[in-house]
Amino acid sequence: IERIVALKPDVVLARPGHKVDERLESLGIKVLTLNAQTYEDMARELEVLATLLGRPGAGTRLWQQMHERMAVLRSEMPKQWQGKKVYFELHSGMAAAGEASFIGQTLHGLGLVNIAGRDLPMYPKLGPEYVVRANPDVIITMADMPVPPPKRQGWSSIAALRNQRYCRIPNAEFDALVRPGPRIDEAARRIVQCLRQLPLP
């Protein structure tokens, strides 16, 4: 707290649920809590931040630019990938990126169908039986995992693994895929790059 106060910031950006927020505000420091979970949240928070920094409209323009880049990326996707099923696994093992999450929105924007549909939470815990039954055409995870999908019992029958359609994103790059913010077009680009290197479905 003391170090933050010493810097005399105009505003502190924070995630919700931190007690430090109240302490900073009691010391007269403005705190902006950001908690984007969807594209709609990100668009709104970017403009709130831009307005706070004295640049109203800049957040909206940035969001539009990102969407334009996303449209270009989708056009670069081989048509064979359109409508194919994807399983996107997060850091925590069997936790998936659901369709309702911003990651799910990115996958949908690229024309992929998420096996963790809208009837599930944003980040559902999927059992191995669920994934095997859903039979995704492609699997996306970080590169270094304790037990990667190809080594999981019973997963060898999944179409993605039978056909070598498994995206292993380097851990250093995976962060851009799973954190909401102005890097969503970068995340989409990384997914497209990986898919273009895999055998076509």
Language-model regions, residue ranges each:
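Structured C-terminal subdomain patch of bacterial secreted/periplasmic proteins
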Residues: A43-T51, T60, V138, M142-P201
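Short beta-strand->loop
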Residues: L13-P16, T33-Q37, F88-A100, I169-P170
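His/Asp/Glu-enriched short active-site or ligand-binding loop at hydrolase and phosphoryl-transfer sites
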Residues: A100-Y123, A143, R168-P170
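Short, structured coil segments at secondary-structure junctions
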Residues: L27-I29, L110, L161-R162
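Flexible loop/hinge segments that line or gate small-molecule binding clefts
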Residues: R15-L52
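Basic- and aromatic-lined ligand-binding clefts that recognize polyanionic substrates
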Residues: G57-V113
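Proline-aspartate-enriched helix->loop->beta-strand connector
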Residues: I1-G17, I29, G127-D144
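Second-shell loop/turn segments in exported
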Residues: P9, V31-A36, E47-R61, H91-M94, ...
